[in-house]
UniProtKB/Swiss-Prot annotation:
Organism domain of life: Bacteria
Gene: rpsP
HAMAP family per UniProt: Ribosomal_bS16 (MF_00385)
Protein name: Small ribosomal subunit protein bS16
Keyword presence, Protein transport: no
Keywords: Ribonucleoprotein, Ribosomal protein
């Protein structure tokens, strides 16, 4: 099974997460199939805190991928921000 989840990067006390589609049995920061976005919880100034490729998320979900609870929340919030602008 494929899971869309966060893979941690960054340095100590400065987390940065890649949103990746990865097999469920692979470790958190291990091999992945595709990077579909990123999340920067400590974004400062003009830095972009979240970027999600909705078309790729939809592609993986249509092929049976599951969203982790945190990624599901982030995607829901990102879609809510995009919808009023359209």
């Amino acid at each position: 099974m494929v899971v869309i989840r966060l893979a941690r990067g960054g340095s100590k006390k400065r987390p940065f997460y890649n949103i990746v589609a990865a097999p469920a049995r692979i470790r958190r920061d291990g091999r992945f199939l595709e990077r579909v976005g990123f999340y920067n919880p400590v974004a400062a100034g003009g830095e972009e805190p979240l970027r999600v490729a909705f078309d790729r998320i939809d592609h993986w979900v249509s092929h049976g991928a599951q969203l982790s609870p945190t990624v599901a929340r982030l995607v829901k919030d990102a879609k809510a921000k995009v919808a009023p602008a359209a």
